[in-house]
Swiss-Prot record:
The keyword Chloroplast applies. This is Stearoyl-[acyl-carrier-protein] 9-desaturase 5, chloroplastic. Residues 1-31 form a transit peptide. The keyword Plastid applies. It comes from Oryza sativa subsp. japonica.
Length: 390
């Protein structure tokens, strides 16, 4: 996860790099100094890490026409992956019914089950929930993408309909996990709520440059990452004996898998009609490294909260550097990147880069694990400052 969480800008052949070169700018790592981080901790709407020199609108004008022409395809191939509201699960389906006579007994039973779950698992579950709760940021991010954004807030275009409906489906995830953890009594809800507010106020910097090629590559990767993460928290919950929590996490994972299918279909179509630019975009995102959506996470105390949460997730096997490599390898195979033909020289170099990257990531991870020392134990405000090993 530590590898997956990193995010640096780096040279590539996609449109954003051409813009960087034309502006005479070099790629930068957007990390504030310790002094700056101390200062920003006193500013309630500023992230602990400031983001600088963001590339904007790297999509060439002629590429935008592709997304206009894909509207009929998107209507036929994306909207059928959404579930009607009346057939969708809702958070209340998994929680004690407050109107029933047995409500208090059900809550007591839930709290008894939660007592058997260790703090490090709750750190992972809270981190996943906080990530889900920053949904306004993700809808905003999708609506920065040229050619597919919701221009009015209620646009009838297929891309806009998809984004709003996707957001509506995702909204249930954070709601359900939030209510469940509130009922457990195991976590500091005020600290969690502060973390959510900080995160939404901070935004995110995925490096997608208003470019839907980059944006849909990013969402393809992220939906698979969240599918894996929620699937692993479901497995752990079952091992701890909380079958209801396992069901909750598994149900959320199933949604993420369906959304992954949609976004990977979009990129598959882009590879079909515009393979050279798409493989350049793929290499661009992987050179930058995929930043996790909550990489600007902050709780008002820990300037490195996301890295600490990621380290616990890595140790527990909830989401790891190996998962990052596996996702990349899965996408390369899913999109048949190795089989692409007729590419430009730059396209062939990008193809080689993405097709050989996963094994390199695994080797780096193996070396890092071999050198790893005993991880420190630090307090997490989410669990009342109890100490958890990283």
């Amino acid at each position: 996860m530590a590898f997956a969480a990193s995010h640096t800008a780096s040279p590539s052949s996609c449109g954003g790099v051409a813009q960087r070169r034309s502006n005479g700018m070099s790629p930068v790592v957007a990390m504030a100094s310790t002094i700056n981080r101390v200062k920003t901790a006193k500013k309630p709407y500023t992230p602990p890490r400031e983001v600088h020199l963001q590339v904007k609108h790297s999509l060439p004008p002629q590429k935008r026409e592709i997304f206009d022409s894909l509207q009929p395809w998107a209507k036929e191939n994306l909207l059928n992956l959404l579930k009607p509201v009346e057939k969708s699960w809702q958070p209340q389906d998994f929680l004690p019914d407050p109107s029933s006579d047995g409500f208090y007994d059900e809550v007591k039973e839930l709290r008894e089950r939660a007592k058997e779950i260790p703090d490090d698992y709750f750190v992972c579950l809270v981190g996943d929930m906080v990530t889900e709760e920053a949904l306004p940021t993700y809808q905003t991010m999708l609506n920065t993408l040229d050619g597919v954004r919701d221009e009015t807030g209620a646009s009838p275009t297929t891309w806009a309909v998809w984004t709003r409906a996707w957001t509506a489906e995702e909204n249930r995830h954070g709601d359900l996990l939030n209510k469940y953890m509130y009922l457990t009594g195991r976590v500091d809800m005020k600290q969690i709520e502060k973390t959510i507010q900080y995160l939404i106020g901070s935004g995110m910097d995925p490096g997608t440059e208003n470019n839907p090629y980059l944006g849909f590559l990013y969402t393809s990767f992220q939906e698979r990452a969240t599918f894996i993460s929620h699937g692993n928290t479901a497995r752990h919950a079952k091992e701890y004996g909380d079958l209801k929590l396992a069901q909750i996490c598994g149900t959320i994972a199933a949604d993420e898998k369906r959304h992954e299918t949609a976004y990977t279909k979009i990129v598959e179509k882009l590879f079909e009609i515009d393979p050279d630019y798409t493989v350049l975009a793929f290499a661009d995102m992987m050179r930058k490294k995929i930043s996790m959506p909550a990489h600007l996470m902050y709780d008002g105390k820990d300037d490195n909260l996301f890295e600490h949460f990621s380290a616990v997730a890595q140790r527990l096997g909830v989401y790891t550097a190996r998962d990052y490599a596996d996702i990349l390898e899965f996408l390369v195979q899913r999109w048949k990147v190795a089989d692409l033909t007729g590419l430009s020289g730059e396209g062939r170099r990008a193809q080689d880069f993405v097709c050989t990257l996963a094994p390199r990531i695994r080797r780096l991870d193996e070396r890092a694990q071999a050198r790893a020392k005993q991880a420190p134990v630090i307090p997490f405000s989410w669990v009342y400052d109890r100490k958890v090993q990283l």
